[in-house]
Regions:
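Conserved catalytic cores of very large enzyme subunits
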Residues: 1-166
Length: 166
């Protein structure tokens, strides 16, 4: 309220694939599965195409297509800028680069076009960074390292380690 006419300083963490910690979680609204009590033949057919026999078996892993649509819309708007073509300064997106990052994904060119043209995004690299080498030269998980499913970035310096919050 005291920064009249200015965008609030905000950050969003963006995943390109459904994060491991959310893949098997069901989407909930009002304390129940998002599709509880819904009977719709078209939705059921879509759910079956995605590997679920019932609507209430759907988990976040079944919604990669929707994730792609959201990421696409976000980066199209972010890259286009405001009505005068000026870039948006906020929110600042932090994109998690994980070992399962889809480098050939449909939106990757849009992400990197934005990075080259505007430089909006921060990239949080989790490829190999959560491992260490033991005395036998083997790559093993480093328990002290940030884990992709336990960290949310808050701009350039602050990272929330969810393991410390729980």
């Amino acid at each position: 309220p005291s920064r009249w006419g200015q965008s609030p300083f905000t950050n969003v963490t963006i995943d390109w694939t459904v994060p491991r910690d959310l893949r098997d979680q069901a989407p909930f609204s009002g304390g129940e599965h998002l599709f509880e009590g819904i009977e719709d033949a078209n939705l059921l057919a879509l759910a079956r195409e995605r590997g679920a026999n019932k609507l209430t078996e759907l988990t976040y892993k079944h919604f990669q297509k929707e994730m792609n649509l959201i990421n696409k819309a976000f980066y199209e708007v972010l890259t286009e800028g405001d009505s005068t073509g000026q870039p948006f300064t906020f929110p600042i997106p932090t994109v998690n680069i994980t070992e399962d990052f889809d480098w050939e994904g449909e939106n990757v060119p849009l992400l990197f076009e934005n990075a080259a043209k505007i430089g909006s995004s921060y990239f949080q690299n989790f490829i190999g960074s959560q491992y260490t080498v033991n005395q036998h030269g083997e790559r093993v998980p480093d328990e002290r390292a940030y884990k992709p499913d336990a960290v949310r970035s808050m701009c350039c310096r602050l990272q929330l380690d969810l393991r410390e919050l729980l």
